[in-house]
Amino acid sequence: LADRLADAVAIGYDSLPGFGRPMARGHRGELILGMLGDIPAVMMAGRLHRYEGYRDEQIVLPIRLMAAMGAEILIVSNAAGGLNPFLRVGDLVVIRDHIDLAYRRGSYLSVGTDSPRYPSREVYDPGLIDVALAGARAGDFRAVEGVYLATLGPTYETPAEYRMMRRLGADVVGMSTAPEARVAADLGLRVLGLSVVTNVAKPERGSASADLPTTHDEVLAVGRGVVDKVCRIIDEVMRSGIV
């Protein structure tokens, strides 16, 4: 995605005070500034994760920096496991809401801001959700609304955990996104969340893939294959006049 920016300038996280270094493969650790059409944009090539030992305050620091730079919209994406039995590998799930099972007491909520400590609001912007779904229809590819569940990671879930998450109402599961999305909404940004379904959970014993492990290489391969879909949705957001 960062390759679509014109006049791009990349700044390594190691050059930015307070930024950590991503450890997950495929996460370069760069903040890239440039133009997306006629709109100034900042992209993160890599994110920090809780399972890497980073505190939520460190994970959301790039979001606070973007807000201070004048950002108005955050589009956040992730690779996720499909819990909903109707999902297929390669589908896009436009996040309607999330369940944060990895939240830790005293972390990122409203720290250092004047907003209420426990704000009650929609994290994901309904208008952006509608635009994203319209973009998928126009591009003739599959995208649905759903609930994202965040876990600590880095291990993938057991079959019993998959069943529990589905009963909680989650459609997809991953190891990121919730801290960034929540603090962005707390700072007044409009948030659009996109999950790429990179594997589908089939926890029932005897199902075709119940005993097949998910590998990080498989996740990366599927993620690379849906870049055009994500770009189409970003283009739709830009054309909509919301930006």
Each predicted region: which residue ranges?
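General beta-strand structural signal in soluble alpha/beta enzymes
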Residues: 43-45, 74-78, 94, 143-149, ...
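Metabolite-binding pocket within alpha/beta catalytic cores that recognizes anionic/polar moieties
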Residues: 1-119
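Non-catalytic positions within long, well-ordered alpha-helices that form the structural scaffold/packing
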Residues: 66-70, 166, 185
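Zn-dependent metallopeptidase/amidohydrolase metal-coordination segment
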Residues: 175-218
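Active-site/ligand-binding-proximal alpha/beta "capping" segment
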Residues: 129, 134-171, 234, 238-242
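His/Asp/Glu-rich mid-to-C-terminal helical/loop segments that flank catalytic regions of hydrolases
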Residues: 202-243
